[in-house]
Amino acid sequence: TFGAEVLEFQLTENPLSEDIVAIRELWAEHKLLLFRNQSFNEAGLVGFSRHFGDLEIHVREEYLSQEHPEILYVSNIERNGRRIGILSDNEVGWHYDQIYLPKPAVGSLLMADTLPPEGGNTEFADMCAAWDALPEKTKIRLDGALANQSYEAFNQAYSVPTNNKQKARSPDIHHPIARTHPVTGPVSYTHLRAHETTP
């Protein structure tokens, strides 16, 4: 089953080791986990996230938390005449977080802070199921194929273009269209339109 809601569980900065093991197993099985009614501050979010691997500092430093640069703000809120977060009011195309890096993110932990009264939904897709649904001849054709991942193309379509320093940190890169999950084994289809320029 794609996606699971974990009930009656409070995330903490220093969880028990058995809780981390259980969360990892659930995450591997369901690919997406939802924890409602949490009371994290930014330090807690970073501390909890570190239990799942090294944290990437996003290339868009102007939208990072000053106290905890591991956190990227996604927001349309303005302070002192400027937006505090990336993407603003744009409807973002389907994408794989940080697929434009040599080593793409294994996952993302999103925490909702200030929500609009309606809309603002975040949608997720099971890309293993998407791969499984492809005709066998298409899978054969795509096996081993690469797609050009361009963070600059993403920004031109959905956000504010990067500066020269940011461009240097995120050059275009080729990644396989089909990737095998390192833990559970199923193949995932990573060809999502937001970052690709050419297959």
Language-model region placement:
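Non-heme Fe(II) oxygenase catalytic core, chiefly the N-lobe of the double-stranded beta-helix
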Residues: T1-R193
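Single conserved hydrophobic/aromatic residue that forms the stacking wall/gate
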Residues: E196-P199
